[in-house]
Amino acid sequence: MRSSSGLNGMRENNSFPDNTRNPQILEVTPLNSMPYIGPVTHASMSSNRMNDSVEKVGGPAMIFLPSDSSSEFSNLISQTKTGVALTGSAAMGKIGLTIGLVDIAESEDSYYFRVALPGVSRDEKEFSCEIEPDGKIMIKGATTTGEQTVCKHNQIFKMLTQNLCPPGHFTINFQLPGPVSNEEFNGNFGSDGVLEGVVKKVYYED
């Protein structure tokens, strides 16, 4: 009973006076106000860093992205109209010269090497690979890239960007780990621009 009467009394005491039924609206200037800034998230931090670090590039540019990142890829490549973007295995190689990169391997009785020669003429009159008994290898050739215009499919194209080697002759020298039998050499210069060679080792008796 007391709880019931008390509840009724609260309802009666909470009745509003007549002058509050039509309240007067007042324009009040706040003493102090600050914009609300939500909690800092990892996504917002990374986007801010990306916006701060990305700079528009007017000339040719090359972007290396070893890992898959579609958002970073789209953001970076959109900053340049003449850029080149590399992803995956293409971005894991050496940065710099395209001609003359060499891989060397060995088995029990032979050495194996391969040399990157993109844009190099395979004409036997211009290309040669000489092997000395001490394991020294000298490659001579001529590049066909770097021209100002390209004629393909009955059309003439003028170069907008040029990053490959200029046309001309060149030499590449490198050393195998040990002496070889230069008469036992098998080589192949493929259409993919890679020269491969296998040469027998030589063992000298003490």
UniProtKB/Swiss-Prot annotation:
Matching Gene3D superfamilies: 2.60.40.790
The family this protein is said to belong to: Belongs to the small heat shock protein (HSP20) family.
CDD domains: ACD_sHsps-like
Region feature Disordered, mapped onto this chain: 1-23
Induction per the UniProt record: Not regulated by heat.
Keywords, ordered alphabetically: Stress response
Gene that produces this protein: ACD22.3
Pfam families attached to this UniProt entry: HSP20
Protein name as catalogued: Alpha-crystallin domain-containing protein 22.3
One GO CC term on file: nucleolus
Assembly: Does not interact with IDM1.
Record-annotated sHSP domain positions: 92-206
Family annotation (InterPro entries): A-crystallin/Hsp20_dom, HSP20-like_chaperone, IDM2/3-like
